[in-house]
From Swiss-Prot:
Organism, as annotated: Rhizorhabdus wittichii (strain DSM 6014 / CCUG 31198 / JCM 15750 / NBRC 105917 / EY 4224 / RW1)
Domain GATase cobBQ-type span(s) in chain numbering: 250-436
Protein name as catalogued: Cobyric acid synthase
GO molecular-function terms, A-Z: ABC-type vitamin B12 transporter activity; catalytic activity
Family note: Belongs to the CobB/CobQ family. CobQ subfamily.
Pathway(s) this gene product operates in, as recorded in its UniProt entry: Cofactor biosynthesis; adenosylcobalamin biosynthesis
Amino acid sequence: MGAVMLQGTGSDVGKSVLVAGLCRAFVRRGLAVRPFKPQNMSNNAAVTIDGGEIGRAQALQAIACRVEPHSDMNPVLLKPQADRTSQLVVHGRVRGTLGSADFREARRPLLDEVLASYRRLREQCDIVVVEGAGSPAEINLRAGDIANMGFARAAGVPVVLVGDIDRGGVIAAVVGTRAVLDPADAAMIHGFLINKFRGDPALFEDGYRQIEALSGWRGFGVVPWLAATARLPSEDAVILERRGGPAEGRVLVACPILPRISNFDDLDPLKLEPGVELVMVPPGRPIPAEAALIVLPGSKATIADLAALRAEGWDIDIRAHHRRGRAILGLCGGYQMLGRRVADPEGIEGPPGAVDGLGLLDVETRLSPAKTLRRVEGEALDARFDGYEMHVGETDGPGRARPFARFDDGRTDGAIDPGGTVMGSYVHGLLANADLRRALLARLGIEGGGRDYAASVDAALDAIAEEIERHVDVDALVALAQAGG
């Protein structure tokens, strides 16, 4: 049939959730749908059915389409490693590391690869729902663009512009985007959506009509604030504010927000647990002394994040927590930090060198160019699980004699200290498994793990689709996709 693309008046206007919601709304109409994002920048990634990696947002959108995530859904992924360098992933595989200035030139030849992925998806479905990146209004980035209008024009995909009314100034944002675009780019936009509206939509009716009059574009609807979004995997390491200690009967789980934190949505399943209070600890604050569990998350730059952790004094908090006999769980990069040493002799993450780890697990990590990407199934803490590995380097040492997990293929993963309170694993997605979550929480003295996280996410996608169906002219978007793309 065709395709439709959502672009935004800026970053964080809610494109990812709207794409997921539209994908599910189209699926509910009996259509075969695929998500697509030409270029993404994120350290939150997922392993695909073809053994590659894509942004977690596109993996969620695939779930909304009721299909397996595939590397074609996000052919170009940039994973920031430092302020001015990113790892370049193309078709799910690492191509190298680029500086921010280098990418402008490097992206030009990538358009053909992006279009090849898009065309393969087109052959599989009725509608491709495409998500842009940032905003087409960033006209300083237009030359060589593959994420927004560069892709839309090359593929002939009609565009709908998304504006975020919650942040204010949405009329200026939509009309201003129209004003700065090249006429040929502006011609690709066939209408707009207003997102994140709170209150009575009748109060914005005049503003909505003014946008139509000033831009010359039709409106496709006003989407309300979607409460069900809170039940979806996080796109950002949201700081959950604490007021006093944990509520009676609840235990506190704390996770420090590291500069290059990755796959922090590993912790989202804990939000389902009524007996758990999850707190993401921002820089400048101590890890709460009353925490029952500290989780060290994944990292795109383990050595740099380990230095940042020490600069915050969090290593002192972690050691004090350990002396109190409380639990610590390190995931991927966090697991590497818990060991005695992290070595990077080939300069994978930065200048070659090695640093001492926290020394809470008797293992050492050696980073190397080869990247491990695979889905896994196995048993840990006497519970079944599935998940995925996504890491560079290998970890070994005497502590590996007490592995955290055993995979079905016979391999082992991670380590547990002799006291059983410090645990490390390379597996992402562990806590999404209800039985394993229940086993971990039992170690903290609470009963949990009763809710199916995947079912909760699926129900949230249905709820978002229902809201979109009530407030958006979905039939008109289907017709737009059929007419173009």
